[in-house]
UniProtKB/Swiss-Prot annotation:
Pfam families: Acetyltransf_CG. InterPro entries: Acyl_CoA_acyltransferase, Gcn5-rel_NAT, GNAT_YJDJ. The gene is NATD1. Belongs to the NATD1 family. This is Protein NATD1. Residues 1-20 are annotated as: Disordered.
Amino acid sequence: MAQSPAAASPGAPEQGCPIRVEHDRRRRQFTVRLNGCHDRAVLLYEYVGKRIVDLQHTEVPDAYRGRGIAKHLAKAALDFVVEEDLRAHVTCWYIQKFVKENPLPQYLERLQP
């Protein structure tokens, strides 16, 4: 499982701990463990073509919302799309919002209409 460390920020899952996104390719999901191992935030995706993924759903438990956790998941998923030279269909409203707020060329050129 690949891990991508992110800078610690106020409101991180545990104060002083960086947000660490884990990528489980077999389950096709990105996760952030919260409160030890008890809770987790997740971003789900599926392959819908040979080189096309659908970024389907992002979920952060209510108690952890507003802390930037979904942003880390979205960035990790889009970075994966870029690194693997994939195309992305974005079903998830949050990832659509993330791309709109972060219109980086490397993300925009990979999006399917």
